[in-house]
Amino acid sequence: AAVLKVYECRALVNSVTGEEESLETVLPLVKEFGAAVVAISNDETGISEDPDKRFEVAKKILQRAQDHGLGVADVVVDPLVMPIGALNLSGASALKLIRRLREELHVNTICGASNVSFGLPNRHSLNASFLSMGIGAGLTSAIMNPLHIEEMNAVRGANVIAGKDPECRNWIAKYREPIAGNNSKCLSRKRKRRPKAKGLPQYD
């Protein structure tokens, strides 16, 4: 609460769970200070491996948030991505949950993208694959390192394919080489005036 009092921008509070104590402590503060909140889809029973149970927890949190006067846009749900090296179906479960959250609750989502690859080799490739599929399922944000090129390429590409990059503007701005513009400038500097020939068309 002390931080929310002095923070000048809109805060994203990390976090609220489906546990009763958490709901009654965090949500009133989020409402009071006009913040948004990350909703962790676990409750007193812990983290379920069943994506349908996690969906119900997320739904409960959203309903309680609305009871406190918060809107859907004020809640960002973390579906809790687990390491696929330990739970082989955790990636598929997370994708199923993300899709349901977006389609049924119309809520934004966030996740720790690198959790999925924990303990496995070539983590960047796995993270990139998960991010691409996550965006396709409706994932709207992720906690990740923007300096990791492979993951960032995957995010940009997935946004294009999913129709989230209007006219591919971000993709083009990032990857198109300004060859045409540079060449035209160079050519204009190198051009020499040609002698005029009577009766022939003149070209620059």
Model regions and ranges:
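N-terminal active-site wall of soluble small-molecule enzyme domains
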Residues: 1-6
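Terminal or standalone catalytic/regulatory effector modules within metabolic enzymes
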Residues: 180, 186-204
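Catalytic alpha/beta core domains of metabolic enzymes, predominantly
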Residues: 25, 32-183
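Catalytic beta/alpha-barrel core
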Residues: 11-20, 89
